[in-house]
């Protein structure tokens, strides 16, 4: 069934989903898709294949949404900016042009975890830090089969740090957003990359 839907996606959108995404969906029946919170609400393969750009769409016509944020902004593959056969991932907000988030889908998963660890969403002042540490471990483990070993080592090291309260946002965090930007610029090089695109809804 999953393979049929992936083939339908390729036929409908003239687009072949990245290998990591295909494997993720093939394994999802047993493990479920990676839990990335409100930042990433995964679309079904059927919805991806059926999507058509709205009248006010300002991004490239070959963009392929695969998920959305809690605010309805779309995470899309963007073949127009592809390097070889590798489409980058962009964020498209309503009536806005695309903002590049990661040079590939694997980098998208990696950066999502960095963003999550830099400001745990919904953390009240009296929250249980042990619970948040457990959630961080679960979040990293959910992408473990899909990321390269050096990125996993970095994420594991970050989630082992003590939680700190960000004085400006009030969020608990394992690392500062400024450190995320440095990691993104080092690990996800791409001419159009927007390293300041953090803490999306």
Where does each model-flagged region fall?
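Short alpha-helical interface elements
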Residues: 34, 91, 114, 130-133
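Compact, glycine/acidic-enriched structural inserts
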Residues: 87-124
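Alpha-helix N-cap recognition
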Residues: 44, 103-109, 135, 150
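A surface-exposed partner-binding patch
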Residues: 1-84, 142-201
């Amino acid at each position: 069934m999953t393979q049929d839907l992936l083939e339908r996606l390729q036929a409908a959108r003239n687009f072949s989903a990245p290998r990591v995404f295909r494997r993720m969906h093939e394994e999802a029946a047993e493990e479920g898709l990676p839990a990335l919170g409100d930042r990433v609400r995964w679309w079904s393969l059927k919805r991806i294949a059926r999507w058509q750009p709205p009248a006010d769409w300002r991004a490239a016509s070959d963009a392929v949404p695969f998920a959305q944020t809690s605010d309805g902004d779309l995470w899309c593959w963007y073949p127009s900016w592809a390097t070889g056969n590798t489409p980058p991932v962009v964020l498209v907000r309503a009536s806005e042009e695309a903002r590049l988030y990661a040079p590939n889908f694997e980098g998208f998963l990696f950066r999502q975890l960095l963003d999550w660890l830099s400001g745990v969403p919904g953390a009240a002042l009296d929250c249980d830090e042990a619970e948040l540490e457990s959630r961080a471990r679960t979040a990293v483990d959910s992408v473990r089969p899909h990321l390269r070993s050096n990125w996993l080592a970095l994420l594991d090291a970050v989630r082992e740090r003590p939680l700190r309260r960000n004085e400006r946002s009030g969020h608990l965090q394992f690392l500062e957003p400024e450190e995320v930007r440095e990691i993104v610029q080092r690990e996800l090089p791409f001419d159009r990359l927007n390293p300041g695109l953090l803490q999306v809804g």
